[in-house]
């Protein structure tokens, strides 16, 4: 009897050792792709930008997004930030450069002319169409005589060419978006921004030759494309005169 008990005990111990999974074998087991513990993707969900009411209104009026015509043109809409003379975000979630179609096509031509001269440079747009109610806020904010005020902001009663989508504020920049030195910042209110006083400011040591050359290059490509500048802002270019704009376009309120 003892002999049979010993045999059963021996077989039991031997069978446990034989079928016990090895530690190394367990470690090497790879999880299946359909495992309940499969790690979810960490890729962020892309949020589609909302189209503002202003942009919908511009599209209905026939204006176009400049970057839809030429995506190489750089955009930094200053009134969609606090980096402007108002120090206020005037446009909210609208941060695109919309212009009348024929005006936008001129900007594209200016970009092409610039690329022919220097492919390492690009136009950088600061402002394009501007609703008249924004123009009114700017007009009200400038505390100076009207004779001085009209040098920097058009009277909203008459309508600025920006209000028609027929003017653009811009500069030159590297392909990384770094603006070239023009001697003043955008929206600088003062004679240092006057194209008509550049040589005078050069002689006075207030502008450098390089800064003036940068301005001249900007004017050159814009002139070639059919724009003309104004006397008090190196960054501002008109596509036509106000009388023509009234005949051709609806003002953006």
Which functions belong to the PLM regions below?
Residues 14-15:
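C-terminal motif of bacterial Sec signal peptides marking the signal peptidase cleavage site
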Residues 19-128, 141, 145-232, 241-253:
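Extracytoplasmic cell-surface/polysaccharide-interacting catalytic and binding patches
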Residues 1-5:
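Positively charged n-region of N-terminal signal peptides that target proteins for export
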Residues 132-138, 237-244:
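Beta-rich nucleic-acid/ligand-interaction surfaces
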């Amino acid at each position: 009897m003892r002999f049979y008990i010993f045999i059963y005990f021996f077989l039991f111990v031997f069978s446990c050792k034989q079928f016990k999974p090895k530690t190394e074998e367990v470690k090497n087991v790879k999880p299946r792709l359909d495992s309940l513990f499969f790690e979810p993707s960490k890729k962020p969900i892309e949020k589609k930008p909302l189209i503002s009411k202003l942009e919908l209104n511009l599209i209905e009026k026939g204006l176009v997004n400049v970057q839809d015509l030429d995506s190489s043109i750089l955009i930094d809409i200053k009134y969609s930030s606090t980096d402007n003379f108002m120090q206020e975000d005037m446009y909210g979630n609208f941060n695109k450069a919309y212009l009348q179609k024929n005006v936008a096509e001129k900007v594209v031509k200016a970009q092409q002319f610039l690329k022919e001269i220097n492919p390492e440079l690009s136009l950088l747009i600061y402002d394009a169409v501007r609703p008249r109610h924004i123009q009114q806020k700017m007009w009200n904010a400038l505390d100076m005589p009207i004779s001085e005020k009209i040098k920097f902001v058009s009277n909203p009663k008459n309508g600025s060419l920006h209000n028609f989508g027929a003017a653009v504020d811009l500069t030159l920049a590297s392909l990384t978006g770094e603006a070239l030195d023009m001697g003043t910042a955008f929206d600088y209110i003062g004679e240092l921004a006057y194209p008509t006083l550049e040589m005078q400011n050069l002689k006075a040591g207030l502008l450098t030759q390089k800064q003036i050359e940068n301005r001249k290059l900007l004017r050159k490509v814009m002139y070639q494309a059919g724009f003309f500048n104004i006397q008090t802002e190196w960054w501002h270019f008109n596509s036509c005169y106000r009388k023509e704009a009234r005949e051709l376009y609806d003002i953006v309120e």
